[in-house]
Design a protein with these regions (language model features):
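Substrate-binding clefts and catalytic carboxylate motifs of secreted carbohydrate-active enzymes
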Residues: 36-40, 62-67, 74-370, 382-386
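Conserved structural position at the C-terminal beta-strand
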Residues: 339, 379, 447-449
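Substrate-binding cleft of carbohydrate-active enzyme catalytic domains
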Residues: 1-69, 75-78
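Extended low-complexity, serine/threonine- and proline-enriched intrinsically disordered segments
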Residues: 300-309, 391-406
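Short, hydrophobic beta-strand segments
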Residues: 324-330, 419-438
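Short aromatic-acidic-glycine turn motif
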Residues: 314-316, 357-361, 397-413
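Short, exposed coil/turn segments at beta-strand boundaries within extracellular/luminal domains
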Residues: 342-347, 449-456
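Short, solvent-exposed loop/turn segments enriched in Ser/Thr/Gly
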Residues: 369-375, 441
Length: 459
């Protein structure tokens, strides 16, 4: 993630010259026989990659990799803004002036991060970035573009031999990106940031309604990035279904619901945030209040039903960016979305409100012969529906041949550490990970909620 220029105090940049050849050799040898390895990345968002010295370093790394394995391709994941970091002031001035002239900006924006939120396309096509990319892409087989979708078509025309992949892209832009992947032969795919959520870059994907609650400036207790298609406990988030629909892998629509507690409020979000929606029809205290239902759907039309009453049809699929919004009123019961293609039903999905008297449920995943044991916990009613709007504090009592390695939820703002043995459910779910103390170890785990509910499982 860095070469000679450090990104933070005491990072790998201090040791790069001494270690890069050894580390490249270890990387290639470790995975040489794995057929799933198709690319070797020589660096991600390297600040100096567009300089003469950086271009030489890139060349040296690529040649080292090829000497060890000439069957795979090399890739550099390039952030054009990072590569032209010393030109940021000029880029801001030029882009701002151009937008003011077009009447798209009032002329008061002088902060680069603010400009990036709304005008990344204009920034990444700046000549200063174009100049740096020529050096950055000179030695690699594939040019990885981080957040530079606006360059796909223009660079294909200017550099007909340049093969491009979206090496990091914003989750909300997958519909736009995928249309370009299908259209342009020189753009071979798309990697989102990110697949699985992680600890760090706290708040980058957290939707907020007050400054400091989300985004890069999120304060305590925010710990997770919250930008993953899959949350940190392994459950799919709405963005993963959005992507599945865009890829043409899902014919049924997918229903999510924006939080009605914030209806009409201004959502503060980074480019990694789609919305604050959750796939649930449980919103305690919001009965009779307006709500936005967000549907990801293929086909050309999608229809929404609330408790059996049609809310009308709206365009869906590629013409709507695969994302359709309906305004309605929340009432417990059920919502159903039906996708159509040329008037014929393609698929449907229903969300039902879970009963408030849900029980604590726990299930051990099959991990025989493995050191780690994963136990899913949820608040479920008798029909197996997860109660998402009444989260509870949980404790875990472990007996037998294991100890708790981590106990938590997908909440980006957990109030307990993962090793405390205490957590709160998030949207009705949590996860406990055990580490066995001996091979073939077994025992029991009892989960207790602060309201008296409990569940016991064997491992």
């Amino acid at each position: 993630d860095m070469w000679n220029r450090c990104k933070s105090d005491l990072d790998y940049g201090l040791y790069f010259q001494e270690w890069w050849e050894k580390d490249v050799t270890a990387m290639v040898r470790k995975d040489y026989n794995h057929p799933s390895v198709v690319l070797y990345s020589v660096g991600n968002e390297i600040p100096e990659i567009g300089t003469d010295h950086g271009a030489k370093t890139c060349h040296d790394i690529c040649e080292k990799i090829r000497s060890l394995d000439d069957t795979r391709f090399t890739l550099a994941s390039i952030n054009g803004v990072f590569a032209a970091g010393d030109k940021v002031d000029q880029i801001v001035a030029d882009v701002s002036a151009d937008l003011v002239e077009k009447g798209e900006l009032d002329g008061n924006v002088n902060d680069f991060m603010t400009l990036m939120d709304d005008h990344m396309d204009e920034i990444v096509v700046h000549d200063a970035i174009s100049e740096r990319l020529e050096k950055a892409c000179a030695s690699v087989d594939i040019a990885g573009y981080n957040y530079m979708t606006a360059r796909y078509e223009m660079d294909g025309e200017k550099y007909p031999n340049r093969v491009i992949v979206g090496s990091e892209t914003y989750p909300p832009e997958i519909a736009r990106n995928w249309e370009l992947v299908k259209k342009l032969a020189h753009v071979i795919g798309d990697f989102t940031w990110t697949g699985w959520d992680y600890i760090g870059e706290a708040g980058v994907g957290v939707p907020a309604y007050q400054w400091g609650e989300g985004g890069f400036g999120a304060g305590f207790p925010c710990q997770l990035a919250y930008s993953g298609d899959i949350d940190i406990t392994g459950f799919r988030r709405p963005a993963s279904y959005f992507r599945e629909v865009v890829f043409g892998l899902r014919k049924e629509p997918y229903i999510t619901v924006q939080d009605p507690n914030h209806y009409g409020q201004n959502l503060i979000k980074t480019p990694w945030v789609i919305s604050d929606s959750v796939s649930t029809w449980n919103w305690k205290g919001c009965e009779g209040k307006p709500v936005v239902v967000e549907i990801y759907a293929p086909g050309d039309e999608v229809e929404l039903f609330v408790n059996g009453v049609s809310q009308g049809r709206k365009p869906s699929g590629v013409q709507a960016g695969y994302r359709t919004l309906f305004e309605t009123v929340y009432e417990p019961g059920n919502v159903t979305a039906v996708a159509y293609e040329s008037g014929q039903e393609m698929g449907r999905m229903e969300l039902q409100s879970a009963d408030a008297d849900a029980e604590l449920w726990a299930q051990t995943e099959d991990t025989k012969g493995k050191e780690l044991v994963y136990i899913d916990i949820a608040l479920k009613d008798k029909e197996g529906r997860v109660l998402t709007d009444s989260d509870v504090k949980l404790t875990a009592e472990v007996t037998g041949d294991a100890s708790a390695a981590g106990f938590g939820s997908g909440n980006p703002k957990p109030v307990y550490n993962f090793n405390e043995g205490v957590t709160e459910t998030f949207h009705g779910r949590a996860l406990l990970i055990l580490r066995k103390t001996k091979e073939g170890g077994h025992g029991t785990v009892t989960f207790r909620a602060e309201d008296g509910r409990s569940a016991t499982v064997n491992y």
